């Protein structure tokens, strides 16, 4: 009997389009290797699809928020379905750039200087602070987005 793989792709992150493409490519390769494959979105029907399809494993093709941050992993672990990707804690730590940075520094892994902007400074104060503390160019990146979403080099 063929092993059944459910691919979860799409989602609501800013990386939705690339996630859908990832899902299609993974499905193509798995089918070539004789797996029974189904693709679904992580929506209100996900648990029903899992219950009806009864996959041996779930391939997590989600990118960004809800796919790489431990959220979908928590759901899958709670219902006891094996899945691809790092576990809940590893995913959450890796997706949060502040937590990742602290882990790197604690383990003496060199990283560029950084600070977390929490919107308490005015734009003028922020620019003044950055000019004093950093050499240009600087990289501005959201704390919890994936890939290069909303990354700016200034």
Protein language model features and the residues they cover:
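Basic phosphate/pyrophosphate-binding loop/patch that engages nucleotide-derived ligands
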Residues: 103-111
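Structured loop/turn residues at beta-strand edges in well-structured enzyme cores
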Residues: 53, 109, 134
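Residue-level signal for beta-strand positions within conserved beta-sheet cores that form or flank
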Residues: 1, 33, 110, 136, ...
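Acidic/histidine-enriched active-site and ligand-binding environments that engage anionic O-linkages
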Residues: 127-140
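ATP-binding N-terminal substructure of ATP-dependent carboxylate-amine bond-forming enzymes
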Residues: 1-89, 93-95, 99, 106, ...
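Glycine-rich phosphate-binding loop of ATP-grasp-fold ATP-dependent ligases
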Residues: 19, 112-116, 137-154
């Amino acid at each position: 009997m063929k092993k059944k793989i459910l691919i979860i792709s799409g989602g609501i992150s800013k990386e939705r389009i690339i996630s859908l493409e990832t899902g299609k490519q993974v499905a193509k390769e798995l089918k070539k290797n004789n797996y029974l494959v189904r693709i679904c979105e992580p929506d209100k029907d996900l648990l029903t699809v899992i219950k009806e399809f009864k996959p041996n494993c779930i391939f997590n093709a989600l990118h960004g928020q809800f796919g790489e941050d431990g959220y979908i992993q928590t759901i899958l672990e709670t219902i006891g379905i094996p899945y691809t990707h790092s576990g809940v804690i590893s995913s959450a730590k890796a997706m949060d750039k502040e937590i990742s940075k602290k882990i790197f520094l604690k383990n003496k892994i060199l990283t560029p200087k950084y600070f977390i902007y929490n919107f308490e400074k005015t734009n003028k104060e922020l620019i003044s602070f950055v000019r004093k503390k950093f050499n240009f160019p600087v990289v501005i990146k959201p704390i919890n987005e994936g890939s290069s979403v909303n990354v700016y080099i200034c």
